[in-house]
Amino acid sequence: MHRHSLRSTAIGTKGGRVATLHIEHPISDLDTWLGAFNRFADARKNAGVRAQHVRQPVGDPRYIVLDLAFDDAEAAHSFKKFLEDVVWQSKDLSPGLDGVPTARVLEDVDPRRLQ
C-alpha cells in the first residue's frame, strides 16, 4: 500500500478550525486510482489542501479512504463541489472510481472539550 501524507495542524492559517474533506469509495484497483489521484496534485494544492491521508481498509484492496485537510470548511466544500460536478462525472477523469463516493466535510471538535 502506498502512503501519502503531509503534516497537518489543528488550527488553520486563517485562525479557524481545520476542515477535513473525508471521502471513501470502491475502486477498480489501486494503481489506476493512484494514477488519477496523482494527476490532480496541482488541483488539490491550488484548492488549499494542507494535508492528505490516503488509506485502505485491511483486507480490502478495492476500497479507498482519504482525508484532505483545508484551512476552513468553505474551501473544503468548494473542492467537494469540484469533485462532484467535474471529476466524478467523467470516467476519463476518474478511471479508478468503481462506485458512488461518499464525501463529507468535517471539523475537529475543540480538543479542550475532550477528556
Residue ranges and their predicted role:
Residues H2-G15, R50-Y63, W88-Q115:
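Glycine-rich beta-strand-turn "strand-cap" elements at beta-sheet edges
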Residues R17-L21:
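Short structural boundary motif marking the start of a folded domain
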Residues E24-P26, D67-A69:
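Short hydrophobic/aromatic beta-strand micro-patches
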Residues L34-H53, A69-R104:
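An amphipathic, aromatic/His-enriched active-site/gating alpha helix that lines ligand/cofactor pockets
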